[in-house]
Curated annotation (Swiss-Prot):
GO terms for cellular component: extracellular region. Belongs to the tachykinin family. The modification Methionine amide is found at M91. Its main location: secreted. This is Tachykinin-3. It is found in: Secreted. Pfam families: Neurokinin_B (PF03823). Tachykinins are active peptides which excite neurons, evoke behavioral responses, are potent vasodilators and secretagogues, and contract (directly or indirectly) many smooth muscles. Is a critical central regulator of gonadal function. Keywords: Amidation, Cleavage on pair of basic residues, Neuropeptide, Secreted, Signal. Residues 92-116 are annotated as: Disordered.
């Protein structure tokens, strides 16, 4: 679900950027200067990548999406354990050893008669 939303956001931004470039209004020199100063605040490796690739490549987009989809899978196991602990807490008991039968003495077990 998270990766689908990320993909939709990246797709929407890339389409807006593509159509925005075609419909862009002429700007004054002052506006252009402030845009460049905003770019100088970015880290150098990101700037290098931005200037090296003028267009968005499909391979780069797929790499970013695959890296983003790896993150939620790593956290799914602890979440499952937390839910298990929650439901066990609702039941009021928890076995420290799984599937260990308790010693049951038949004399202490109530009987409702003999089934025929």
């Amino acid at each position: 679900m998270r990766s689908a939303m990320l993909f939709a956001a990246v797709l929407a931004l890339s389409l807006a950027w593509t159509f925005g470039a075609a419909c862009e209004e002429p700007q004054e020199q002052g506006g252009r200067l402030s845009k460049d100063s905003d770019l100088s605040l970015l880290p150098p490796p990101l700037l290098r990548r931005l200037y090296d690739s003028r267009s968005i490549s499909l391979e780069g987009l797929l790499k970013v999406l695959s890296k983003a989809s790896v993150g939620p899978k790593e956290t799914s196991l602890p979440q499952k354990r937390d839910m298990h602990d929650f439901f066990v807490g609702l039941m009021g008991k928890r076995n420290s050893q799984p599937d260990t039968p308790a010693d049951v003495v038949e004399e202490n077990t109530p009987s409702f008669g003999v089934l025929k």
